[in-house]
Amino acid sequence: MEKLKNELQAELTQNIMPFWLNKMVDHRHGGFLGRIDGHGNPVPDAEKGAVLNARILWAFAAAYRVLGKPEYLEAATRAKDYFMAHFIDPQEGGVFWNLDAQGRPLDTKKQTYALGFAIYGLSEYARATGDEVALQQAKDLYADIERYAFDSLNNGYVEALTRNWQPIADMRLSDKDENGSRTMNTHLHILEPYTNLYRVWRTPQLAERIANLIDIFLTRLLNPQTNHLDLFFDDRWQGRRNIQSFGHDIEAVWLLHEAALELNDPNVLQRVEHAIKAIAKAADEGLQADGSMVYERWTDTGKMDTQRQWWVMCECVIGHIDLYQHFGDTAALDIARRCWHYTRKHIVDHEQGEWFWGCDENARPNLVDDKAGFWKCPYHNARMCLEVMERGPHPQPLSKGRGE
C-alpha cells in the first residue's frame, strides 16, 4: 500500500497537476482553456464547460488541502474566481452550462449535474481555505437544487431545467445519454457534493437530504436482480434497465460508503455496507485478465463496450481501495494495484503529460477524444491519487467485515 501511495503521489505532483498548471491556464481570456485535443494541441477558441471548470477548482483545492503547495492554492483561487464571475447566473441563480472562449454564456440551461459539481468545487475550496464567500455560494446552489430540481411528489431530482427553472424538452447530459428525467449519474453527483458540503456545513436538513439520496440509490437505482445500478428513468422511476456501467457501479460503491460514514448513522451505514458489497461484486464483472475494467454492457444485445476509459480505471482503483481499507479485503487491494499498473502502462501519457482518454482492448491509445476538455478533467485521476494518499497504509475496519 505504501508503494502504491508513493507512486500515485508522484503521478499527481509530477504529471497530472503540472500539465494543468503549465498548459491549461488561459492567459488571454482568464480562467482556463476549454480544450486540448487528443494529440496535445490547445484549442484556444473552444467553449468552456461548467463541469470542466468546477472540476479544475475541486482538483486544485483538494490537492492544496492535502499537500499545501502554494501553486495549487493559486490555481484553485484562479478557478474559483473565474467560476463565480462567469458561470454563476447573477439573475436567476444556478450555473450556466457553458461559455464561449471569452467567458460569455452560450447554453444557459440549468443542468443539475453541473450545479452539483459547482457545489463540489466550491465546498472543497471552503474546506481547504476557510473561505466564507465560496461556502455561501455552495449553500446558495444547494438551495437552488432543492427549490427547483427536487421532485417531492415522486422523490428524486430532475435532470435539467431552462435558465429560469422551467421544464425543458432535451434534458440529456450529453448526446450519448438517453433523454430521461431521472438518471443515476446525476443522483450520484448530487450525493457526492452534498457529502462534501456536509463536511463544512453540518446541518440536519443537509443530513436528511443525504440520507434520502442514499435511500434512492438502494430502493430505486439498484437493480435487485443484477446488483448493478440502472441508469435512465422517467419521472415515476420507470426505466429500460438495459445498460450496465461498470465504472459507475464501482464509483458508487465508495461514494455511497463515504456518504454513510460521514452521516455516522449506524442503521444507514449497515444498509449501505450490505449493498455496496453486492454492487462491487457486480462491477467486477467488468474486470479483464489484463487488470483493466471495461466500460459497459448492453443487456438487451449482450454487446460489451471494451474501451478502457481513464475515469473507469480511476474509480476501479478507489472503489477497491475502499473495500480493502474498511473490510480488509486483500483481493480488492490486488485488483486496485493491477488496475493502476495497467493504467500507468497504457493510459498515462509519459511524453506530453496527463492521460489519454483511454485505449482499446489492444492497448492502442485513443487520440481522437480530448486530452483535456468538456468531459476530460483533472478530477477522476487527481482524486484517485488523493484518495489513496489520504488513506492509511493498513486496513482500518470501521464496520463489520465483507463476509457478513
Language model region names:
Residues M1-P393:
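Glycan-recognition and catalytic cores of secretory/periplasmic carbohydrate-active enzymes
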Residues G392-E404:
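Intrinsic disorder/low-complexity segments
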